[in-house]
Amino acid sequence: MKKSIFSKKLLVSFGSLVTLAAIPLIAISCGQTNTDQSQQPGSGSTTGGQSGTTTGTDSTTGGQTGSESGTTTGGQTGTTTGGQSDSTSTSKEQGSSDSTSTSKEQGSSDSTSTSKEQGSSDSTSTSKEQGSSDSTSTSKEQGSSDSTSTSKEQGSSDSTSTSNMNTR
């Protein structure tokens, strides 16, 4: 008797979780990802397959443009309300601009990667931290500029490229 009650509660909890997870996916597929409908004014421009609503001053045409102000709402719903634009991704945080990735944090701009943190810009890499920029592309950002490397920390600059800009 106890087991059936527990399994019913588990089933109800799982059903609620699936329902909550399905709502933002439906919203993303309909193109209305900002659930509270209160967009902040800004000049964000997005390109190509966009599911996140951008309201900051970032543009997705070449990495981060330096704006890291704003907040994100909705966890993995793709709803963003400040300084972020992303394409085909799920969980983004403030100030990031990325393509085909999953978990991003403030100030990162990357492509085909998984875990990024504040101030990093990288392409085809895995673990970055604040202020580092690891890239095999031409777009560099604040802090440091690294090319074709994997793990960088704040303020470091390892590069085999000719373009190195330290903005901080």
From Swiss-Prot:
Its main location: membrane. It is a lipid-anchor. A lipid is attached at C30 (S-diacylglycerol cysteine). Residues 1-29 form the signal peptide. The numbers of repeats can vary and is one of the basis of the antigenic diversity. Sequence repeats lie at residues 81-92, 93-104, 105-116, 117-128, 129-140, 141-152, 153-164. InterPro entries: VlpA-F-like_signal. This is Variant surface antigen D. A lipid is attached at C30 (N-palmitoyl cysteine). Residues 81-164 are annotated as: 7 X 12 AA tandem repeats.
